[in-house]
Amino acid sequence: MAVPKKKTSKGKRNQRHATWKGKAAVAAEKALSIGKSVLTGRAQGFVYPMNETSEEEAD
């Protein structure tokens, strides 16, 4: 069975943790930006379903 030979240092652990947290922060910022653009109606980079109930009620 494979086992690590030595304990990972706190510095290496913190470095990996910081990388993970940084990637999560970038993803969260991007999601927030996309959400804001959808709410303001300025989203042009993707297609999302519109509410069809309002069109049916108008007819």
UniProtKB/Swiss-Prot annotation:
Pfam families: Ribosomal_L32p. It comes from the Bacteria. The keyword Flavoprotein does not apply. InterPro entries: Ribosomal_bL32, Ribosomal_bL32_plant/cyanobact, Ribosomal_zn-bd. One of its GO terms (cellular component) is large ribosomal subunit. The keyword Transferase does not apply. NCBIfam families: rpmF_bact. This is Large ribosomal subunit protein bL32. The gene is rpmF.
